[in-house]
Structures are given as structure tokens and as C-alpha cells.
Amino acid sequence: MLILVSPAKTLDFEQPPLTQVYSQPDFLTHSQELIQVCRQLTPSDIATLMKVSDKIAGLNAARFGEWQPDFSLDNAKQAIFAFRGDVYTGFDADSLSEDEIAQTQSQLRILSGLYGLLRPLDLIMPYRLEMGTALSNPKGKNLYEFWGDTLTQAVNEALAESGSDIIVNLASNEYFKAIKPKKLQGQLISPVFKDCKNGQYKVISFFAKRARGMMARYIITNKVNTLAELKAFNLAGYYYSEEQSSPTNPTFLREEQ
């Protein structure tokens, strides 16, 4: 199985990584193109474009200015340890074994507005550039047009290398929109997580994000290879619901917390 997840806005570049093993992102030339565009933006432009505070806009203007593509462990960090946030809390990479971290390198891919498609051990420098940002660039009016078919092709290549034909989409809609499902050369599965609130099952963003991270970890640590094995996911009180599921959207429910 090849797993797709979103990145996180929250970053941790303070704690040292748990391994000295790393790889370099595949699309740094593309990243450099975007950085050149972003460097034309004033902090005020960034605040408006990204809908962030002046403080965060200033921070990211500085990050764009400092960014350079010669990554090492001195100035960058592996993506799986740099990203924090709900999905990554659920995934809990810090407690994986060395073998499991190695497994994530072939089985997990992180969609990114700046870096395109990251392997877990790819080095990144701090940034904020969400996939849904309407950043005008030489290839179009937003990042979806910038990346075009590039990320879909990269997912197909990663899928072929993984030896599986199942893609488990645990990314948000914003990020998965960068992929063209009809061009994927495998079976696409997009799990849904619903929590019971006031007697009704619904997707609650905070819980769903954590559940996505937990499922990504579950696939890695349990060596899940089939849809039947995926349906056995039962962490944090979730259970598979045949009634609420469709062939491409296995649905997991949890009672009120």
C-alpha cells in the first residue's frame, strides 16, 4: 500500500531528529521556482494571500529569504520529524523503530505545496505554503496549475516501486486536489472517520486528522497489504462500519468521547 498524507502548518526544528539517515526531495528545482515567486511578496502580500497575522507573514517572508537548496542536517530536518500537528500526533513517528522508519520511506508520501511530494526522510527547510494558496506563478494562477500532472506521475512511480496497487488517501481534500485520480495507476481508497456527536455520526476535523495519522501508522506497523486488513483498524475506539462504507470509502465510526 502507498499512503498519502498532508503536511502540517506546525513545524519542529528544535528537537534533534531520531536518525541521521536522510534523503533529498525530488522536486527541489520546482521548489526553487516557487521560492523565487514568493521572494517577490512583501510581508503584507503574504498576510493577505495566506490569511495569516502580520507576525506569521513576517516569519514566512524571512523563511523564503533564507531558503536555499543545499540541504544538510545542519540547516534542515527530515519531513516526518519536522511536521507536527494532529496527523503527526496520530502517526507518532518518534516512537517508530528503525525498521519501521525505513518502511515509511517506501510506503508513505507527504503532499506539499512547496516540495511537491516528499518521502518521510527527505530533508526540508522551514516553510509555509499551503497547496490551496492562490499563488500566481509562471505555470498558472495557483499551485494546482503549477504542479499539473507532476505529482500524479510521482505517485504512480512510487506505487510501482512499492509493489502494491492500492493507494490509501489519508490527505485532506485541499492537498489531494493536486492529484488527478483518473490518471492514477492503482486502486484508490479514501478512508472516512466519523465521531458520534449528539446521536449523529459526523466528520469532526480534529479527530479525523488524528485518526488519519493513526491509520497511516497502523498500516506501517501491522504490515497491512489488503483492504480486508485495513478494515481491521481499531485504534482509539474506531471500528469499521459496513453500513456506512462504500467500495472506495471505507468508513470508521467512534462513539461519543
Curated annotation (Swiss-Prot):
One of its GO terms (cellular component) is cytosol. GO terms for biological process: response to hydroperoxide. Coiled coil: none annotated. Pfam families: H2O2_YaaD (PF03883). NCBIfam families: PRK02101.1-1, PRK02101.1-3. Belongs to the UPF0246 family. This is UPF0246 protein Sbal223_3241.
